[in-house]
C-alpha cells in the first residue's frame, strides 16, 4: 500500500504543502497526491492569519490522511521574517501534536543534500530533482509547494536509508 508523507514549508504568508504516496521500497513508484499552498492575507491581523493556517492545515490533514509529516527546520536570516515564520511553524507543530502525527524536520541544506547530493545546490536543482524523481511534466509551482514536495521526498529517502 505504501505510506503517505506530507511535506510542509512553513511561512506566515504562505505555507507550502506536498503529499506523496511512497512505496515500501525503491522498487515501487512514487505518486504525487497533492500539492499547493495555504495562504493568508497580508493585511490581516497576525492572530487571524495564524488561525487560517491552523484551520486549513486541519482540513488538509483530513483530506490527505498522512502517516508522517516532514517540516522545514527554521533557520535564521532576516530577524523580522524569522519571527513570523516561527509563529506559523508553531501553529503547524501544534496541529501535528493535536493530530498525533509523527514528524521529522530537515534544514534546507539537508533537503538539498538528499535530492542533489550537494548541500549548497541552487533551488532550481532541487526543483528539477523533484520533477525527475516524480516523473512530472513540470516543476510544481509555486516554489513553496515545490519545497514542501522536496521535504516529503527527503523524509522518504531517509526512511529507505
UniProtKB/Swiss-Prot annotation:
It is found in: Cytoplasm. GO terms for molecular function: crossover junction DNA endonuclease activity; DNA binding; magnesium ion binding. The active site is at 9, 72, 144. It catalyses: Endonucleolytic cleavage at a junction such as a reciprocal single-stranded crossover between two homologous DNA duplexes (Holliday junction). Transmembrane segments: none annotated. CDD domains: RuvC (cd16962). GO terms for biological process: DNA recombination; DNA repair. It is an enzyme of class 3 (hydrolase). Its cofactor is Mg(2+). The RuvA-RuvB-RuvC complex processes Holliday junction (HJ) DNA during genetic recombination and DNA repair. Endonuclease that resolves HJ intermediates. Cleaves cruciform DNA by making single-stranded nicks across the HJ at symmetrical positions within the homologous arms, yielding a 5'-phosphate and a 3'-hydroxyl group; requires a central core of homology in the junction. The consensus cleavage sequence is 5'-(A/T)TT(C/G)-3'. Cleavage occurs on the 3'-side of the TT dinucleotide at the point of strand exchange. Homodimer which binds Holliday junction (HJ) DNA. The HJ becomes 2-fold symmetrical on binding to RuvC with unstacked arms; it has a different conformation from HJ DNA in complex with RuvA. In the full resolvosome a probable DNA-RuvA(4)-RuvB(12)-RuvC(2) complex forms which resolves the HJ. This is Crossover junction endodeoxyribonuclease RuvC. It comes from Synechococcus elongatus (strain ATCC 33912 / PCC 7942 / FACHB-805).
Amino acid at each position: 500500500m505504501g505510506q503517505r508523507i506530507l511535506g510542509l514549508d512553513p511561512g506566515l504568508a504562505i505555507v507550502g504543502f506536498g503529499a506523496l504516496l511512497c512505496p515500501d521500497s525503491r522498487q515501487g513508484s512514487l505518486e504525487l497526491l497533492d500539492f499547493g499552498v495555504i495562504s493568508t492575507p497580508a493585511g490581516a491581523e497576525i492572530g487571524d492569519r495564524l488561525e487560517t493556517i491552523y484551520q486549513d492545515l486541519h482540513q488538509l490533514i483530513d483530506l490527505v490522511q498522512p502517516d508522517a509529516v516532514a517540516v522545514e527546520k527554521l533557520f535564521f536570516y532576516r530577524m523580522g521574517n524569522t519571527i513570523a515564520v516561527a509563529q506559523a511553524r508553531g501553529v503547524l507543530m501544534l496541529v501535528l501534536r493535536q493530530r498525533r502525527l509523527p514528524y521529522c524536520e530537515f534544514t534546507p541544506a539537508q533537503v538539498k543534500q538528499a535530492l542533489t547530493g550537494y548541500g549548497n545546490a541552487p533551488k532550481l536543482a532541487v526543483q528539477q530533482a523533484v520533477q525527475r524523481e516524480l516523473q512530472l511534466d513540470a516543476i510544481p509551482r509555486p516554489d513553496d509547494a515545490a519545497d514542501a514536495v522536496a521535504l516529503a521526498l527527503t523524509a522518504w529517502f531517509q526512511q529507505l536509508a
